[in-house]
Amino acid sequence: MGMNQTPASERVHISFFGKRNAGKSSVINAVTGQDLAIVSSVRGTTTDPVYKTMELLPLGPVMIIDTPGIDDEGELGALRVRKSYQVLNKTDIAILVVDSTTGKGEEELALIHRFHKKGIPYLVVYNKIDLLSGEGIKDLAMSVRPGEVLVSAADGMNIQELKEKIATLKPEDTHKYPLLQDLIEPLDLVILVVPIDKAAPKGRLILPQQQTIRDILERGALSLVVRDTELKSTLDHFLAQGVCPKLVVTDSQAFARVSKDVPENITLTSFSILFSRYKGELETQLEGVATLSSIQDDDRILIAEGCTHHRQCGDIGTCKIPDWIRNYTGKKPVFEFTSGTEFPDDVSSYKMVVHCGGCMLNEREMKYRIACCRDQGVPITNYGLLIAQVTGILKRSLGPFPEMQKLV
């Protein structure tokens, strides 16, 4: 995702489902007015979910997801169907495309049941009505219920109506809290600590840093970005001028050094902890970090990241966090790792789950993962809270959230 685009995690996710050759890809192309999806008469052309970002008026920035057929067959087919079902966990609006010449079958009805179970708003789109006789179209139209629409992707019939119906399903902003706008006032100074090490991307800031800067700008406050190596001299300079920063936000990995350089009277937290509140449930993840004290040898711990990136020596998820946990607990647990869209439905065998801040996941998917853990009685925490705990500054790192500090 480029720096000048809306992050994928902040876009409305619109997913198209249906059997093979129901015309999902054709409907996508008709709705978007672009050749976003490959169209073929060969059954099963879409073999993995395909993601495309675009602007779709009047919805604005959206993520269009084309999924494999829900009736795919064989061993590989079953894996593709599983991939389609996984997409549900991040779907804000579901579009079920049905071949009007065959109608809804067991697969479609089962999928509608899943929509209801997950609380996903959806439309049923009967495609290929151009292949029906006049009488057939009339009969189908008589049976159409609210939330269903007849279209022909081939000739564009009723596509505008479909777009208008999709727009009515636009989800409300469900974020309980902003990223940090409620923590600061206009003209407050916020210092962001961004270490530049070998893991930092070349020529840009990572997404959590970009989004935090944007949130500060929207509040009318001031942001100053410094490296951890210049933080102390920067603070000394401002304090000597009688200017006290309202908040310092750091990369969690730098907590140990930064906490020593930031005076106790200045509030300190991390990007990861801010995102824990913004994307998920801070209190749930705070409760989860307490599990560290009961870790034993051979306990299984899942470390999950929402993105896929090239792992280097010293990678935070696969190297640093396991080392911190081993050093803090004095135990030798077994670590397992997932990244990107992969997250197990069954986490019951894990002692705990440690998740990244989830900046690349939309809110629905992050909350799904938290719910998976909660429903199965498995504690979940996030990188920032865990690092704060092992460095001995957990209570201080929650300075912006006094109600959370009381729980420590």
Tell where the protein language model's regions lie, with residue ranges:
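G-domain G4 guanine-recognition motif of GTPases
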Residues: 67, 97-102, 120-136, 149-158, ...
